[in-house]
Amino acid sequence: MTATKQHKKVILVGDGAVGSSYAFALVNQGIAQELGIIEIPQLFEKAVGDAEDLSHALAFTSPKKIYAATYADCADADLVVITAGAPQKPGETRLDLVGKNLAINKSIVTQVVESGFNGIFLVAANPVDVLTYSTWKFSGFPKERVIGSGTSLDSARFRQALAEKIGIDARSVHAYIMGEHGDSEFAVWSHANVAGVKLEQWLQANRDLNEQDLVDLFISVRDAAYSIINKKGATYYGIAVALARITKAILDDENAVLPLSVFQEGQYGVENVFIGQPAIVGAHGIVRPVNIPLNDAETQKMQASAKELQAIIDEAWKNPEFQEASKN
């Protein structure tokens, strides 16, 4: 757990497009004092090169130790961030990645735990809700110390899309996407607000959007990744900054409320899955979920989303290899 020492150490596992963008975001924002980057042996030199390149920005930002790391370096880390995994290709859903990325995740988590690591896992590889669950299972860690990026990026996309339509700074638009980080996610329209004014009331007063506009807006948010992947091959800047925000909340013990993939223990009638909902996060991980009162339609969407994730998990855990590796 973090905040037990003044030195703030992050280990990044995976130096691909997401990982390297995350590392750049940490440097730009002056987050963490030490950053180790782990890559597979055949890409070790890339990690060395990225560490060197990033270090050349430190004179413009703040001091930080940056280096190509090994799993042994995880032993005294505050936070291990997992971005490594097979990338989502055009035409693939995040859930299509399950088989490939569960095996990768098992190898990573096993080696991190064997180092003596006793901090917090932050998972961003897709499908993130399933891989957050597998990180919890393979690590044996308490659920509070295994966190997925969840719907943090989706919620940011939602806020920005609304902000652009109504001409308001996105930081003054408060709205959440909940559920799976993927096709079954949903917008929590019942609590969306602009500077404390319910979105419904705002729209009645300003007539910025009609009902069909809102439907189209949500679809554009839900399908944003597919659109970007078709245009440029991958998404990485948005999720990198989302991960940096979560990292700062943990290292600085902010007790910030962020939409993350967190373990469900009956809230919304859902159990035994990690799924996107707001939660308080600080130096010890998840302090507690924030159970926003959903209306009936939203609750049904949450349950349907969880059911899809549960089916994927149940199918995956028929694999004896994953059963044997489970510690939770």
UniProtKB/Swiss-Prot annotation:
Location(s) in or outside the cell: Cytoplasm
Entry keyword set: Allosteric enzyme, Cytoplasm, NAD, Oxidoreductase, Phosphoprotein
Residue(s) carrying Phosphotyrosine: 226
Active site (record annotation): 181
Documented EC number(s): 1.1.1.27
Major localisation: cytoplasm
Activity regulation, free text: Allosterically activated by fructose 1,6-bisphosphate (FBP).
Any one Pfam family match given in the protein's UniProt record, by short name: Ldh_1_C
A GO molecular function held by the record: L-lactate dehydrogenase activity
Pathway stated in the Swiss-Prot or TrEMBL entry: Fermentation; pyruvate fermentation to lactate; (S)-lactate from pyruvate: step 1/1
Complex and partners: Homotetramer.
Name of this protein: L-lactate dehydrogenase
